[in-house]
UniProtKB/Swiss-Prot annotation:
Subcellular location: Nucleus
Annotated family: Belongs to the AF4 family.
The species this protein was found in: Drosophila pseudoobscura pseudoobscura
Biased composition (Acidic residues): 463-474
The keyword Coiled coil is assigned to this record: no
MF terms in GO: DNA binding; transcription coregulator activity
Keyword Nucleus: yes
Keywords for this protein: Developmental protein, DNA-binding, Nucleus, Pair-rule protein, Phosphoprotein, Transcription, Transcription regulation
Name of protein: AF4/FMR2 family member lilli
Lineage: Eukaryota, Metazoa, Ecdysozoa, Arthropoda, Hexapoda
Ranges annotated as biased composition (Polar residues): 402-414, 626-638, 647-659
Functional description taken from the UniProt entry: Has a role in transcriptional regulation. Acts in parallel with the Ras/MAPK and the PI3K/PKB pathways in the control of cell identity and cellular growth. Essential for regulation of the cytoskeleton and cell growth but not for cell proliferation or growth rate. Required specifically for the microtubule-based basal transport of lipid droplets. Plays a partially redundant function downstream of Raf in cell fate specification in the developing eye. Pair-rule protein that regulates embryonic cellularization, gastrulation and segmentation.
Length: 1770
């Protein structure tokens, strides 16, 4: 011990004589001289060899770093072997150089290894100590023992490995020094063995004897025998987390060893250079930067030389340790040092560091190095002096130095010894006591060991280290203290280990900074009492660890914490590694704590192998992060880490799976963010939208976040979130900011590491919140809208989210405006709500604002919002944001409604809303569940909600929702139109009459969309004159939300509003707003509706609170709707040409909208409908139901509805009856999802609707009996007074809402409730039963309606309608014919939901006919009634209404319904259109909204059957998001799900999680395809294909199993095959250009016949003909053609490319066969109906939506088998 102390003193003196105390320096010098002499005598030969090797290594420090990184694995082997060898052959330089410290494969293994390793170290230590006592040779002989002195001798070799290398090398060169070094090394030896053993790998198995086997000679390549050749990351699992640190430390140590060995032996005099270079194997390159950045950067000891000399300082610090040579001290050291196993266990997560630290049995040795770098008094004094002042910073420095030296964990801690008491406390609480006991003389050594433990912990928490980088402040402090204490040591040690250890220490130091500081001070005092101090430190460190562990005690909390850390900056892979390695316990906790601040460093660390461990140091030094020649696998984020393929390829590219935790939010080196799957933030599958972003844009971010968090917690975040991955980041943002104090260090996080630091943080924070609660539900956490269907979340207060099982938080977020906000507008008054120019923030918000706003505002408006044209949507978003205040003002009137719509609804709604999308609407509403987010993103994207409507229609119409769609469309139209009118920010005509005239202009569009929804009509009528204005509004021109406050029927409406205050009342408010937007709705009807619905949405949300206001709104809406209706028919005639032109013009916008919406809401988008798109249509239906239910539950409202219906009596009764019947049919098959969404709306804005839903489906469907209809119509006239302006339109709107709403609402309502799904299934069953009856009725009604329509067309009033009819359907006859055909077809394809569409169209036709028959007054009354009764529905239907208008235009396409429906009112056509045409109809419908003209153009409904299909050209590619944050979040989500699946025990959950991960990878690849290089995209696609193939092979046995899950597994397998097929096709497409070139080249080659023909027996002309060999071989050569190598290569490539094409088709066919053989046609048919068919032309976002929707359905089936069975029976 005395010798060790002397060595330490000498080394310290050599390294930092100026820093060491004079006495210590003198003693060290003297001792070193003596020891060097002895060592020279004993090791002259070794020194010579070592000097040469060390010189080479010294020259190749950089090489050594890389080499060490490569050798890291080799070192592992060697360490294993060397443990034995060193124990037996410690003096052998090579053997000693090979640190055979055991590596931990897992945390458990780490514990075992730590115990064994420490035991081995203990033996080595005893041998060294005892031998050292008897002779200095053991120290000298033992490279590790010797190594420590050289670092001290070599001011630069701070790492134990370099020290040991230098020690052994210089042991012979400097016998005296090596003796003292040996003693110190004995202390360090174990530490070095621990620290250097990994570097011991450095000594290559490649028998290069000259250099202690530390690292190759400079020129020698570091051979990585171990596959994970990134020396940075030890292959073993636990070490990986620490591997960054360890590998850094190892590579540093190896390089340090090489430098120390070669340099120390050869250049012991070079000591400082060697230590500098050695520690640097990395530090050499980062000699200055690592130390400065980590410690010198802290500025405490800026001079790298100081850092070089800290070895000397450490030697000085170790002067007290020489007494430690005493047996008692040795024993105590052994006891304490080797006891470190316990801390190591807690630090198990940081295998390398813990192992090394464990092996660094002598903390003093580490302290020696630490002191050497610090250049302060002997370890004992130095820790106190340096560590006391700089304690936190010093500890980090020491650890970095240590890592840079030999085994960064040990060495860095050793070098940090004095400075790293904190680190030891953190990582090595157990060890320091042991070390202290053993090394009482070297108190610093003990702290160093503690530091080692800390280093271990830090390395264990490599992520934590990186995360610590995030906590740059703490780490900087640590750096500062390190710089002061370890300025020189920090150079190497800091670079490699300071990142991991210092940041890790920083974590602990942050927590234990004071403790560590005290420890440093104590160490000064405890130099004499080092054992006690070590024990205290150990205890304190353990306490700290315990505290940390307490914090991390719960995995959830740990995850949360680590999430926060990672979010803070731990987002980096290192951070992820740390997070993943929570096993480190206290260390992990500390690391996590520092992670936020150190995350930046970690992030940079993740960039390089060294960066992972030194990433923290990178934060401090910034050099370590990129310095990692071989980044730890944790730094490699390429998908390969997620796939079986090795992640060694590019150190910067791939992060080893062990290092990166998918469960921990973080940022991969490429900037990709890993967001824990459990994060619920991605509630809706919003393609590129973030619900949270929308909310944020809508200023509802907080609300949204809260809602989403609630949903996450309550629902555990279903995976259904769909594409809106970024919302996680957004949601996380809050939590990250709130929960991550570590974020203070974020500034240090490298931008390259965190592309989206804020988002990563947010996602991490949120992830931490939801990750803990929802980690279990990782797969489901992404979609809050996918919350358990049976789970009914009580509606929260205003601003909170109504958590509905199937609806995303954003949608359900009820922007509860207090009733005061929903003050009813005075009757006959126009409420103008100024809307900020939408263009201000149109596009960005287009996705987010709407989303957020819808989430905030009443969900009901989702569908209405969908209907708004994209421009309107955009305007809506802007208006939502700009008119947020306006909404507050007009909330009572209109704005709330708009909000909801803005969400995800628009897409689907536009898809289904426009074309009688009841079924589509239900699909849309389900899609809206996730759609709100999508819509929010897509709405802006798709400026034509018509697109969304058409898309919806594509979904539902393709799903044969023609019949369903019409009904739904009607309902939607009513509610939507109303909602839209309210929300539409437009220069709306102030009064009803003006609206009527305006409606005339917008009447076509109004008809399209308003026929389906009275609200829509009303809004159109009010905005018909402002239709162009609306368009402008859509264009974000100055907009005012014009609310027609017609309260002529206020009392009745009030009743209705009271009845349907939640649904109808809100609908009424929506209607009021809808009427203004209705005119502009035509193309922009969706937009207007969108805008309107945004405002009314708030109202709807408010309405439940203020039913009275709602009823007023209902009245207003109803009047608006009525006027819209009337205006549609009346002014529609006048403005037909104009409207048609507008529509045609709008068609383009609609097409754009449709295209966008199609992309957004494409059924393939994976449940846009399911995931939170709320189809207002449902509310309309619900409103109808409300009418029925109100009559039953609330007599007065029902009477009001009856009055309105009386107006509608001739046709409406039939229509209503048909609607009731039709709606059931519609909602039957694919609308479960939609129903959920719709229910969401109803729940948000209508309470009575729920009551109505309580009614049996049959009651709801047929609730309005003819008598009831008559009664309602009778009552209706009183209300029509209010809506007298648009009677015709009112008719259409009213029927639609009445028709679809009852059943859809019932179904949706049911879905919202736990039993709702069952109810929905029952409803579907009843609907199926009723379908036959309804079909019969519908047929008759359709005939009657056709007749009526013909009459109306003939009539002057019906002239325009005729135009519509003619436009919709070429002629009444054609319409009738089409209706009949469609009815028959629907009936035939009853199972396919076609029957439902038929019923709906029939109802629509009947209604339309009735409406046409009815006078405008009647229509107005009916419309008002519909608006009043379905006030809430109006809000919902308003959005749908816009689509309805579009759909109406397209309705001609649907044979029976369209032909009949379109002419009378856009309602029927829209229904049909929706059902038939998904996207194109919306555009066409919008164009047709003009009325006849568009209708006529669309009129050729010849493709009656085609109506169910959408044109291939209707689907436009979704606008790609350039938001890298979202792209990163996709990757994070994918990684999280992949990791969650890895740890999942249930086979079904595992396979679904894997498949979810795959589709998220596909989203990532899709986004990369637009932003990254083709090669990167190719790689991720190829890796994803490998992953999915692996998954498929893994779960193949389950497909044949006879257990109940084999069918579900088969369905998942089919989805998997589809994905594989599309990925294969994508791989071909990515190489299509290359393939074309290759084919052309090969074609030319074969055409020209180039190439020499070789006869079978003709000897080669190359060799002599006499050549026996040539003859012999030639004689056996078959005849053939010599193909040039180039051609052969091209043939190989061609084969590869064409194999992808072949595989794509083979896999697709295989999936089709499985569908048929497994009798899964119904399942996939329903999926196609709801989400659009999945084809080989589908885009990745569509694949994502489709697969997500399918997996959600399967999950629901598994979790609710009874409901599923019920559904099947239905």
């Amino acid at each position: 011990m005395a010798q060790q102390q002397q060595q330490q003193q000498q080394q310290q003196h050599l390294q930092h004589p100026h820093q060491n105390t004079n006495s210590n320096n003198q003693l060290q010098q003297q001792q070193q001289q003596l020891q060097l002499q002895l060592q020279l005598q004993l090791q002259e030969q070794q020194e010579q060899q070592q000097q040469q090797l060390q010189l080479q290594q010294y020259n190749n420090n950089f090489y050594s770093q890389n080499y060490n990184m490569e050798e890291y694995e080799r070192r592992k082997r060697r360490e294993r072997e060397k443990i034995e060898r060193q124990q037996g052959i410690q003096i052998d330089d090579r053997e000693t150089a090979l640190f055979s410290e055991p590596r931990r494969l897992t945390e458990g293994d780490a514990e075992i290894t730590a115990a064994l390793g420490e035991f081995g170290d203990a033996r080595v230590y005893i041998n060294q100590s005892t031998v050292g006592i008897s002779r200095h040779a053991p120290g000298a002989g033992n490279p590790r023992l010797q190594a420590p002195p050289p670092p001290k001798t070599l001011g630069h070799s701070h790492s134990p490995s370099s020290s040991s290398a230098a020690g052994s090398g210089s042991g012979s060169a400097l016998p005296g020094q090596s003796q003292s070094q040996q003693q110190q090394q004995k202390q360090h030896y174990q530490q070095q063995q621990q620290q250097q053993r990994p570097p011991g790998y450095l000594k290559q198995a490649d028998n290069k004897p000259p250099y202690n086997g530390r690292g190759g000679y400079p020129g020698q390549p570091m051979k990585n025998d171990i596959p994970s050749s990134s020396g940075m990351a030890p292959p073993r699992g636990p070490p990986r987390s620490g591997s960054g640190s360890i590998s850094n430390s190892n590579s540093n140590s190896s390089s340090a060893t090489n430098n120390a060995t070669g340099g120390a032996a050869g250049t012991t005099p070079l000591g400082p250079p060697l230590s500098t270079q050695m520690p640097n194997g990395r530090e050499k390159s980062f000699l200055g930067p690592p130390a400065p950045a980590l410690h010198n950067g802290a500025g405490l000891f800026v001079p790298p030389a100081a850092s070089k000399r800290p070895g000397g300082g450490s030697g000085a610090g170790l002067q007290p340790p020489p007494p430690e040579k005493d047996i008692t001290k040795m024993i105590s050291e052994m006891t304490n040092s080797f006891r470190v196993t316990a801390p190591l266990t807690s630090i198990a997560a940081t295998p390398h560091a813990p192992t090394r630290e464990n092996y660094n049995l002598n903390g003093p040795n580490t302290n020696k190095y630490a002191f050497g770098p610090i250049g302060s008094p002997p370890i004992g004094s130095q820790p106190s002096s340096l560590m006391a002042p700089l304690f936190a910073p010093i500890a980090p420095i020491a650890s970095p130095i240590t890592s840079l030296l030999t085994t960064p964990p040990h060495a860095s801690q050793g070098s940090l010894g004095g400075a790293s008491p904190v680190a030891p406390l953190q990582q090595l609480p157990p060890t320091p006591p042991k070390a202290a006991a053993a090394l009482s003389p070297t108190a610093a050594a003990k702290p160093l060991k503690t530091e080692k433990n800390h280093t271990l912990e830090k390395q264990d928490s490599c992520l934590e280290n990186d995360l610590e980088l995030s906590e740059s402040e703490d780490e900087q402090r640590k750096k500062e203290s390190r710089s002061a204490g370890n300025s020189s040591n920090s150079s190497e040690s800091d670079s490699s280990e300071s990142g991991s250890e210092s940041s890790s220490k920083g974590d602990h130091q942050q927590q234990h900074h004071h403790h560590n500081h005290h420890h440093q001070q104590q160490q000064q005092q405890l130099q004499q009492q080092q054992q006690q101090q070590l024990l205290q430190q150990k205890q304190q460190h353990q306490q700290i660890l315990q505290q940390q562990q307490r914090q991390l005690t719960a995995n959830g909390s740990k995850k949360k914490y680590s999430h926060s850390i990672i979010a803070g900056g731990g987002s980096t892979i290192s951070g992820l590694l740390t997070s993943s390695g929570f096993g480190s316990g206290g260390a992990g906790n500390g690391g996590c704590s520092t992670a936020s601040s150190g995350g930046g460093g970690g992030g940079s660390g993740s960039g390089g192998g060294s960066g992972s461990s030194s990433g923290i140091g990178t934060m401090s030094s910034g050099s370590s992060s990129n310095k990692t020649p071989s980044p730890t696998e944790s730094n490699k984020w390429t998908l390969s880490r997620f796939f079986p393929k090795p992640a060694n390829q590019t150190s910067s590219e791939s992060v080893s799976p062990g290092n990166v935790s998918m469960k921990v939010p973080g940022i991969l080196p490429g900037g990709a963010q890993i967001i824990p799957e459990s994060i619920e933030v991605t509630t809706a599958i919003v393609k590129n939208e973030k619900i949270h972003d929308d909310h944020m844009d809508m200023d509802e971010v907080e609300e949204e976040d809260e809602d989403e968090e609630q949903l996450q917690q309550q629902q555990q975040l279903r995976y259904g979130a769909g594409l809106s991955v970024t919302p996680v980041a957004v949601a996380v943002k809050k939590e990250a900011l709130d929960g991550v104090g570590e974020m203070g260090g974020l500034p240090a996080i490298p931008k390259n590491q965190i592309k989206r630091e804020a988002e990563a943080l947010h996602s991490a924070a949120r992830l931490s919140d939801s990750g803990t609660s929802g980690s279990g539900s990782t797969s489901s956490s992404s979609s809050s809208s996918d919350s358990a269907p049976g789970e009914v979340v009580p509606m929260p207060g205003p601003g909170e989210t109504l958590q509905l099982p199937g609806v995303p938080a954003a949608i359900t977020t009820v922007m509860r405006v207090h009733p005061t906000l929903m003050q009813k507008a005075p009757p006959n008054s126009v409420t103008l709500t100024p809307i900020l120019p939408l263009p201000a923030s149109p596009k960005q918000r287009q996705k987010k604002p709407r989303k957020k706003k819808p989430a905030t505002s009443a969900p009901i408006l989702d569908s209405s919002d969908d209907d708004d044209p994209p421009a309107a949507k955009h305007a809506l978003e802007l208006s939502a944001a700009a008119a947020a205040a306006a909404q507050a003002q007009a909330t009572a009137t209109v704005p709330p409604l708009a909000v909801k719509k803005g969400r995800g609804r628009p897409r689907k709604q536009q898809q289904s809303g426009g074309s009688g999308n009841l079924s589509s609407a239900s699909a849309g509403s389900s899609s809206q569940t996730k759609g709100p987010t999508l819509t929010a993103a897509k709405k802006p994207l798709v400026k034509g909600p018509a697109m969304a409507n058409s898309r919806k229609r594509d979904h539902s119409s393709q799903s044969s929702s023609n019949g369903n769609t019409p009904t739904k469309k009607l309902a939607m139209g009513t509610g939507t139109g109303t909602g839209t009118a309210m929300a539409v920010p437009m220069t709306v005509i102030p009064s009803g009459p003006a609206n009527a005239s305006a409606v005339a202009a917008a009447s076509s569009s109004s008809d399209e969309d308003s026929s389906s929804s009275t609200g829509s009509t009303g809004s159109k009528s009010s905005s018909s004159s402002s239709s162009s204005d609306d368009t402008e509004t859509t264009q974000n021109t100055k907009c005012r939300i014009v609310k027609l406050n017609k309260t002529g029927a206020v009392p009745p409406l009030a009743r209705l509003g009271a009845v349907a205050s939640a649904g109808a009342g809100a609908g009424a408010g929506a209607s009021g707003s809808s009427s203004p937007s209705s005119s502009s709705s035509e193309p922009e009807d969706h937009l207007a509706m969108s805008t309107v619905s945004a405002l009314p949405m708030a109202q709807q949300l408010m309405q439940p609170y203020k039913p009275r206001a709602v009823s007023q709104h209902s009245q207003q809406l109803s009047s608006s709707e009525c006027s819209s209706s009337s205006g549609s028919s009346t002014s529609g005639d006048e403005d037909e040409a104009k409207r048609e032109k507008e529509r045609e013009r709008k068609r383009k916008s609609d097409k754009n909208k449709i295209s966008t919406l199609t992309r957004i809401f494409n059924p393939k988008e994976g449940g846009a409908k399911k995931q939170g798109q709320v189809v207002i249509m449902d509310q309309s239906e619900e409103q109808q139901q409300v009418k029925v239910g109100d009559s039953s539950s609330q007599p007065v409202p029902v009477q009001n509805a009856a009055i309105a219906k009386l107006r509608m009596t001739p046709t409406q009764q039939q229509q209503q009856l048909g609607a009731g019947l039709a709606s059931p049919a519609r909602t039957t098959t694919p609308h479960l999802t939609s129903l959920i969404c719709k229910i969401d709306l109803s729940k948000l804005s209508r309470e009575r609707i729920m009551r109505l839903k309580k009614l049996t489906p049959s009651q709801q469907n047929g609730h309005l009996t003819p008598k009831d209809l008559v009664t309602i119509q009778t009552q209706g006239p009183s209300q029509p007074v209010q809506g007298h302006l648009l009677p015709a339109k009112v008719k259409h709107e009213h029927p639609h809402p009445v028709k679809p709403e009852p059943e859809l609402d019932a179904g949706y309502e049911s879905k919202f409730k736990p039993g709702n799904v069952k109810q929905e299934f029952q409803l579907k069953q009843e609907r199926d039963r009723e379908r036959e009856r309804e079909r019969d009725r519908d047929r008759e009604r359709e005939r009657e309606r056709e007749r009526d329509r013909e009459r109306e067309r003939e009539q002057p009033t019906g002239g325009r309608r005729r135009k519509r009819s003619s436009s919709s359907s070429s002629s009444p006859y054609k319409e009738k014919k089409r209706k009949k055909e469609k009815s028959d077809h629907l009936q035939i394809s009853k199972d396919q939901l076609l029957p439902v569409p038929v019923l709906l169209p029939s109802n629509n036709h009947e209604r339309i006919s009735c409406h046409e028959r009815l006078s405008f007054d009647k229509l107005q009354l009916l419309h008002e009634d519909a608006a009043a009764v379905a006030a809430a529905a109006a809000a919902v239907s308003a959005p749908n209404g816009s689509p309805s208008k579009k759909l109406l235009v397209m309705s001609p396409l649907p044979p029976p319904p369209t032909a009949v429906v379109v002419p009378p009112a856009v309602v029927a056509p829209s229904t049909c259109s929706e059902a038939v045409q998904t996207t194109p109809p919306s555009a066409a419908a919008t164009a047709t909204a003009a009325t006849s003209t568009t209708g006529t153009s669309t009129a050729p409904p010849a493709p009656v059957t085609r109506l169910i299909y959408r044109s291939y050209f209707d689907r436009e590619e979704e606008p790609h998001s350039d938001d890298h944050r979202k792209n990163n979040q996709f990757l994070v989500e994918a990684v999280n799900r992949k990791h969650a699946a890895d740890s999942e025990r249930d086979s079904f959950n595992q396979v679904t999680l894997y498949l979810e991960a795959v589709v998220y990878f596909l989203l990532t690849a899709d986004s990369m395809e637009r932003s990254s290089s083709e090669q990167a995209t190719w790689t991720i696609y190829k890796d994803t294909l490998s992953l999915i193939k692996f998954i498929s092979s893994k779960f193949r046995p389950y497909q044949q199993s006879t257990n109940g899950q084999h069918e579900t597994h088969n369905k998942v397998a089919i989805l998997s095959l589809r994905c594989q097929s599309l990925i294969s096709l994508k791989l071909y497409k990515l190489r299509r250009t290359n393939c074309r070139t290759v084919i052309n080249s090969l074609t030319e080659f074969f055409r020209t016949g180039r190439g020499d023909i070789v006869n079978g027996n003709t000897p080669s002309s190359i060799s002599p003909s006499n050549s026996v060999g040539s003859q012999g071989s030639g004689s056996n050569t078959p005849p053939g053609k010599i193909v040039p190598q180039e051609i052969h290569t091209q043939l190989s490539k061609q084969n590869e490319y064409l194999t992808y094409v072949n595989s794509a088709h083979e896999l697709w066919d295989q999936a089709d066969r499985l569908v048929r053989t497994g009798n899964h046609i119904d399942f996939f048919r329903e999926l196609d109906h709801e989400n659009g068919p999945l084809t080989l032309h589908s885009t990745m976002p569509e694949v994502f939506r489709y697969v997500q929707a399918g997996l959600k359905t399967l999950r629901d089936a598994v979790s609710h088998p009874t409901q599923q069975t019920l559904h099947q029976s239905h």
